[in-house]
Amino acid sequence: MYAVELDRSKRLLVISAAQRVTAEQAKLAAQRVRELLHDVVPGFRVLADYRWLDSMDPAAARHIAEIMDAIAEKRAASVTRVIPDPHKDIGLNILSQFHYGPEIEITTFETLADALQSITAK
């Protein structure tokens, strides 16, 4: 399952993945990200919460890449990830190398509290 929200007042895109994510769910999430970012100006931040993710279909990878491309095209300032278990990275670090430019700051935290503290400190 994927959820995508945009808090315009905080200029924060929140992406959450939970349980088992299918390729179709990832595809819908990519479409939703593009819709929400349509009129967003550069410099917004992204919080990607993977605390409740159990697994992701390998076919979802291309849609995750589409999400990353949309974020990069709209020139996000930063991407903050919450991944409690580094072994459940699901290839995000590798995909990031190809889909985010060096101008996007990427940080990963094990807890949501640490991630939020990092975001609010910026």
Question: What are these language model-derived features?
Answer:
Residues 1-122:
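Amphipathic, Lys/Arg-enriched alpha-helical "gate/interface" segment within cytosolic domains
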